[in-house]
C-alpha cells in the first residue's frame, strides 16, 4: 500500500495513492452559492470543472491559506480537489503498521479516519476520503450506499 502524506494545520494526514489522479499548485476558485461550508469553490484547470474542498474547514480548523496544493481525486466520475498545505512524500506501510483508531483522536477525525501510521517519530492519520466526499456530497450515493459507508 502506498500513501501520499500531506500537511494540514501542522498535522500529517494521508490518502491512498491509488485515489490520487494528480497534484497541482493551488488556483483561485469560484465560490458556489448554497454549498457545503467545506466546498471552497470550483475551478477549471484543463477544460474540466473540479470541485475544491478545504480539508481544514471540513476538519473544523482554520481555513487553509490561498496557497499550497490541490490533491485531485476522481470519485464516481466527479473530479474533487482537496486543498492541502504541502505534500510530504509517499509512505509504504505494511498493513500491520496501520494502527486502529482509539480514543486519542478527536471526534471530528475519528469518524473519517481509517487508521494511524506511525513513522519517523510522528503519526499520520489515514483519512477515509470516500466518507468525506459522501458527507459533503450525499446526493452522489443511494440511501443504501450512504448507510453502508457511514456504519
Q: Language model features by range: what are they?
A:
Residues 1-151:
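An acidic, low-aromatic, low-complexity terminal/linker signal
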Amino acid at each position: 500500500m502506498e500513501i501520499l502524506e500531506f500537511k494540514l494545520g501542522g498535522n500529517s494526514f494521508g490518502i491512498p495513492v491509488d485515489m490520487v489522479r494528480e497534484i497541482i499548485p493551488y488556483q483561485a476558485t469560484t465560490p458556489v452559492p448554497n454549498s457545503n461550508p467545506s466546498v471552497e469553490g470550483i475551478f477549471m484547470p484543463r477544460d474540466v470543472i473540479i470541485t475544491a474542498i478545504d480539508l481544514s474547514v471540513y476538519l473544523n480548523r482554520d481555513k487553509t491559506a490561498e496557497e499550497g496544493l490541490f490533491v485531485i481525486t476522481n470519485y464516481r466520475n466527479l473530479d474533487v480537489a482537496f486543498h492541502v498545505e504541502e505534500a510530504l512524500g509517499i509512505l509504504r506501510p505494511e498493513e500491520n503498521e496501520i494502527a486502529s483508531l482509539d480514543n486519542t483522536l478527536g471526534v471530528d477525525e475519528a469518524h473519517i479516519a481509517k487508521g494511524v501510521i506511525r513513522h519517523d517519530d510522528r503519526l499520520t492519520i489515514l483519512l477515509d476520503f470516500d466518507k468525506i466526499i459522501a458527507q459533503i456530497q450525499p446526493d452522489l450515493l443511494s440511501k443504501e450506499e450512504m448507510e453502508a459507508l457511514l456504519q
